[in-house]
Structures are given as structure tokens and as C-alpha cells.
Amino acid sequence: MATLEDGTSEDRVANDEYKIWKKNTPFLYDLVMTHALEWPSLSVQWLPDVAKDNSDHTIHRLILGTHTSDEQNHLLISKICMPTDDAQFDASRYDTERSEYGGFGAVNGKVEPDIRINHEGEVNRARYMPQKSNIIATKSPHADVYIFDYLKHSAVPRDNTFNPLIRLKGHTKEGYGLSWNPNKEGLILSASDDQTVCHWDINANQNVAGELQAKDVFKGHESVVEDVAWHVLHDGVFGSVGDDKKLLIWDVRTSTPGHCIDAHSAEVNCLAFNPYSEFILATGSADKTVALWDLRNLRMKLHSFESHRDEIFQVQWSPHNETILASSGTDKRLHVWDLSKIGEDQSAEDAEDGPPELLFIHGGHTAKISDFSWNPNEPWVVCSVSEDNILQVWQMADNIYNEVDEETPADVVERQQ
């Protein structure tokens, strides 16, 4: 059992690591912004639209949620101002107090709620429908999945009324996993602690109370289902993972899984299908590893990514680079991996920093990372949120992924372990 002293020591280490990270930020990043939210957000996702502000800035939007103590929770659509590619980056503009770099000043770096929607309980996860980004699904501490059209809500709620567009019924417990079908509008999957995956078509007729029963309920896991994801290229295929340490691959037309794999040595918390390759997917686990799989031969994992120091709760592929994958979790770190570097020769000194496929470690958080999202419009830009209310928008220095600058001092770009 952890003692108070252990916690204090852990906090001290985290604080020291953060100071080192902050000192090296101008050398490791082209862009960093740190913002303290009013309440922690367990979920984050960039919306796909971008608006032009002026010659040097564009306005992006984020889907966030709140996790309050006893106050009203909200689903948030927030806007953020970001410098354009042709904005002049100046190292002298780095703000050590705010840990901001890359053109963000005290005004430009604000994250401001644009629309605030009443939500029943904290927002465990929120994701927009790819075909209509104004339609957002959320998971909460309650069993139902909620659907909102944020265009039908004012900037600030008029009262405390909770008014989702649709309530999706079918689960008996809460959960986190949520996935919209990228190829068929309106189809959505949800994973739950009740050991099932539910499937709905939100275009189907709902009852007078605005409720819609699940089209299908998939039962194959023997414990909590942690995550679910549609295949990106095959519209009827999806995967699920759970606390039974298994990866299940399903066809939506069949009630039993086509594949059932013992994927990890501990609970499997997340999965993601590669958007470029129809055969490749990744899973993240409490065993501190990310596993790479080929659907053509699931008997053996292709590779195990090992560098995290604690449970992994989120894994996502870059929308711009086929070989780039990121993972995050309890160790307060977000790791960016490059599959093309697997098996490359390393010096003993480099090996101490991690395997060759470990491209970058984002060390800006001092608490568990709850969620992160790749920006769909700006390559290499990531937004990550942690349990201590912190939201960070960041982009690693281009010499790290372009390998242009061989002269950068090793002590400066040393990965934060």
C-alpha cells in the first residue's frame, strides 16, 4: 500500500522531471501551449473545421468535457487560436512561466469555450460523427450513450435542463469505448463495463421520448469491455478489447467474434486500426506495452512497443503518416512511435533512451494523460489532456521527425524518461 511519503516523493520526482522538460522545450518543440482548464477533461478531440483569423493565425476547435466535483457538468466546444505555418517563430518569444513556445503569447494561447452544453454526469468520452461533425456522441457514468447536435444549443445553457437529441439504450453499466463508423453515416459502437458492445443506427426511428434501442448487442468478452473501434476501410468489421486480456475481431452481421486472441498479459485498454493499411492494428495494455497486429495472422503479434512505465489507456495512429503511432497513459507520458524504424541498429548510448522506433516522448504533463488527439489539419500537432486540468497543444521540432539536424547536442534533445 502506498504511503503519504511515497506520494510526496513521487510528486517531487514528477516536479523535477517537469522542470527539465520545461528547460528543454525550445529545443524539442516547434509549438507548445499549456492551458489550465476550469475542470479536468477526460476526453479531447479536434473538430475537422478550421477558420482563418488573420494573416498569422487560424482558429481550430476542440471537443472537451468536464469532470466536476458536484457541480453541473458540460460538453464543451472550445476554440483555440493557432499560428499558421508562415507565422514567424522566434525562440526569444518562449515564455518560461507559461511553458509556451512557437508564437503563443498571453492572448493568442487561450482556449475558450464556444458552446457549453449541459451533461448528465462527467463526460467519459466524446466523439463527433465523421460525416456530420456537428453530431457528437458522449459516454457518462450512466449506462446510456447520448447524442447531441451542438448547432441546436446556445453558447451558454439557459437553465440546468439536460436535453440530448437521442438517448441510446442497451447497456446496463457505464463505459469509455465509443466509435463512429467512418464509412456509413449514423452507425455507432459503444463498449461497456457490462461486458457487451452495443451497435446503433441513429438514423433509425426513435420513440417519442427520444430513445433508441440497440440494433445489436455483441457478447463475447468475459469481463469489462474497455474499448471498441470500427475498421477504417471495411465498413462491417470492428474490434473490441477488454479486461479479459483479449482482442476480439467481429463482423457486424454475426453475433460471435471471428477472432478471439489472448493479446496481452494484463487488461487491454485501447485499440486502433491503421487508417492506411487494411491489415494493421495496435492495442495498448495495462502490461505497459503497445502491441502491433496483422489481421491476416493474429496468432502472433508483429511487434511489442516497450518503453512506457505504467498502464497504457490510449493509442492512436497519425492521420498523416502511415507508420506513426502514439500512446499515452498513467505514466504521464505520450510516446510517439515510428514503425519504419523497428529493428534499426542503435548505439549503446541511444539504446538507453529507448528502442529505435521510439521517436519522441512528450513529457509536459505531471498527471495521468486521460486522452489525446492528432490534429487532422496540422501534421504533427497533438492536443493532450491530463487529470490535473492541464490541456497542452504541441508539435515536436521538425528536425526530430525529418532527421535534418545531425548536429543537435545529445543532451538537449535527450528524450525525457
Swiss-Prot record:
PROSITE patterns: WD_REPEATS_1, WD_REPEATS_2, WD_REPEATS_REGION
Chief localization: nucleus
Subcellular location: Nucleus; Chromosome, Centromere
InterPro entries: G-protein_beta_WD-40_rep, Histone-bd_RBBP4-like_N, WD40/YVTN_repeat-like_dom_sf, WD40_repeat_CS, WD40_repeat_dom_sf, WD40_rpt, WD_repeat_RBAP46/RBAP48/MSI1
Disruption phenotype: Decreased protein levels of DRM complex components including lin-9, lin-37, lin-52 and lin-54. Double knockout with the programmed cell death regulator mcd-1 results slow larval growth. RNAi-mediated knockdown results in embryonic lethality. RNAi-mediated knockdown leads to a reduction of hcp-3 and his-1 protein levels and to a depletion of hcp-3 on centromeres and a reduction of H3K27me3 levels on metaphase chromosomes. RNAi-mediated knockdown results in chromosome segregation defects during mitosis.
Keyword Chloroplast on entry: no
Family: Belongs to the WD repeat RBAP46/RBAP48/MSI1 family.
Description of how the protein assembles with itself and partners: Binds directly to helix 1 of the histone fold of histone H4, a region that is not accessible when H4 is in chromatin. Probable component of a NuRD-like complex, composed of at least lin-53 and hda-1. Interacts with lin-35. Interacts with hda-1; the interaction is direct. Component of the DRM complex, at least composed of lin-9, lin-35, lin-37, lin-52, lin-53, lin-54- dpl-1 and efl-1. Interacts with hcp-3.
Function summary: Core histone-binding subunit that may target chromatin assembly factors, chromatin remodeling factors and histone deacetylases to their histone substrates in a manner that is regulated by nucleosomal DNA. Required for hcp-3 and his-1 stabilization, localization of hcp-3 to centromeres and for proper chromosome segregation. Synthetic multivulva class B (synMuvB) protein. SynMuvB proteins are required to repress the induction of vulval development by Ras signaling and probably act by forming the multiprotein DRM complex that represses transcription.
PANTHER family, per database record: WD40 REPEAT FAMILY
Protein's name according to its UniProt entry: Probable histone-binding protein lin-53
Origin species: Caenorhabditis elegans
